[in-house]
Every structure is written in C-alpha cells, then in structure tokens.
Amino acid sequence: REDTTQFIRSDSLVLQFLEYSNIPITDNNKVKLIKSGREKFEDLFEAIRGAKHHIHLEYFNFRNDSIANALFDLLGEKVKEGVKVRAMFDAFGNWSNNKPLKKRHLKAIREKGIEIVKFDPFKFPYINHAAHRDHRKIAVIDGKIGYTGGMNIADYYINGLPKIGTWRDMHIRIEGDAVNILQEIFLDIWHTYGSTCGNSVSGCGLQSK
C-alpha cells in the first residue's frame, strides 16, 4: 500500500498555531527554559520578592500544600509593601485536585489583602461549562517578568508523588515584549471574574513598564 504520510516542519506548525490563536509574534524577548519544579519556584519566588507594583497569577489550581502556603505568605508580605496582588484559579481545577482551596483557605488569603477569584464557578447545569476551563499557568510581575508553561502551584513538582515518582514538566521565564501579551490574557479574564478594570496593560491601575 502506498505510504501517504505527510510530514510538516515543526516551525510551520508553530506558525499555524499562532495564526489560528490570534497570538501576535514579538521580538525583543529574553527567554529562559525552566526544567524542574525546584528551579521554577525558586525563580518565581525571587521575582516576586523584587516586585514593586503588581503581581498577577493565573493557574488551573493552587494545591493547598507547603509551596502554595509559602507563596501566599510571601504575597501577603508584598501586599504590606504596597504591591497589588491578583490571583485566579479554575473552579474545576481546584475541585478536582486532592488538596483544594476551601472557603476557609480563601478567607485567610483574602485577609492578607490578596485579591483571589475563581474562573467559571460551578453553576447549574454544570455540563454547559465542562469544556470551558482555564488551564493557563501565567505569572506576571510588574509587567516586566512573565512565566508560563506546564506547572501549576503544587509541591509535587519538587517532591514527586508516591505512585508516580518524579514529576517532569517544563516552564519558561520571559522578559521583553511578550510579557505584555501574558498581561493582556490575564486582564481579559480578570475583567470577567475579578474587578472591572479593562483588558489592557494600562487597566487595573497598571502602567506599562
């Protein structure tokens, strides 16, 4: 039988994805590949410590464990310094993990001055929302530093899991024009589920750095 398999260059696939997703191509970027959970959280926490204006976090879930607790403690300290902190997580992503953030945890987080909201909270009939989930993992610090990739906020990215072992995933740190795109993606969702403050880098009291 004749082999009709067609191969497409990987760079062509990337260009097709960018075209269909309406994500603009940018240059003037510095990108760092992060290969482990330990490296990701050390890098992210260090960037958060240096924040002067705002911190934006959008994740599928914040697992209620040691790394999330350390993160929210650090974010609370940044609020005391006058830094605006906004965070979002997916309602299903939170419900489906084995250590979800419950009402009492969210209350404690908000008492630290952190704005935190759920993406698409459960509403009847839930089936209408089953495929409408937010799997993004985005962090933006001061509009200057951005993170995205495959890792949520959970300590198993560092410690692994008993039945699985070491958890392998990747993340990237970005500095440059592409950070503005991550910022706009975050604010577009925040406009719906958080405060009404527009969907541009100048919204929510922000300034393009």
Predicted feature descriptions by range:
Residues 1-209:
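N-terminal localization/anchoring segments of enzymes in phospholipid and broader phosphate metabolism
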